[in-house]
Amino acid sequence: MITKLIPRKVFFTSGVGLHSEKLESFEVSLRDAGIEKFNLVTVSSILPPNCEIVTKEEGLKELSPGEVVFCVMSRISSNEPGKTLSTSVGCALPRDISKHGYISEYHAYEENAQDVGEHAKKLAGSMYSTWTNEAPLKTFSIPRSSSVQESGDWMTVISAAVFII
């Protein structure tokens, strides 16, 4: 029998990491977001039908270190001093929970968190409306922004929607 991997729950998180090595700055951003213990697999932009949105704390209780975890992630890195890095995931909730919604990911240089968050909400809402010909029940986003320090160390900023099967 084939088991369908349809997430039951989702939580949203973000993080910032700084390190002299690019890869390690990503690891630090995962730690800041609280999702460093998992083998993350990025997926595209569907919020499954009947998927419950939970807090990060509730979601983390259901996951185990080393578990393969699916997520929609926005990620950006740079070591250019003073450069602003911003990420966001946006979500469009369906009017009927038995239908799917959308999750968008967006990142940008030199844009603030509010603008990136608004853009991610707009993307998710647009994907939903062009499918249903109606506005979503609600849109929201989880933006994060930070500026690279003068030291020139690598900075990585992430935002993620993390699924629980």
Swiss-Prot record:
Family: Belongs to the PdaD family.
Top EC group: lyase
InterPro entries in the record: Pyr-dep_his/arg-deCO2ase, Pyr-dep_his/arg-deCO2ase_sand, Pyruvoyl-dep_arg_deCO2ase
Cofactors named for this entry: pyruvate
Keywords in alphabetical order: Decarboxylase, Lyase, Pyruvate
Gene3D superfamilies: 3.30.60.30, Pyruvoyl-Dependent Histidine Decarboxylase, subunit B
Known catalytic reactions: L-arginine + H(+) = agmatine + CO2
GO molecular function: arginine decarboxylase activity
Gene name tied to this protein: pdaD1
EC number(s) from the headed UniProt entry: 4.1.1.19
Co-factor note (free text): Binds 1 pyruvoyl group covalently per subunit.
Pyruvic acid (Ser) modifications at: 45
Site (Cleavage (non-hydrolytic)): 44-45
Coiled-coil portions: none
GO annotation terms (biological process): arginine catabolic process
UniProt name for this protein: Pyruvoyl-dependent arginine decarboxylase 1
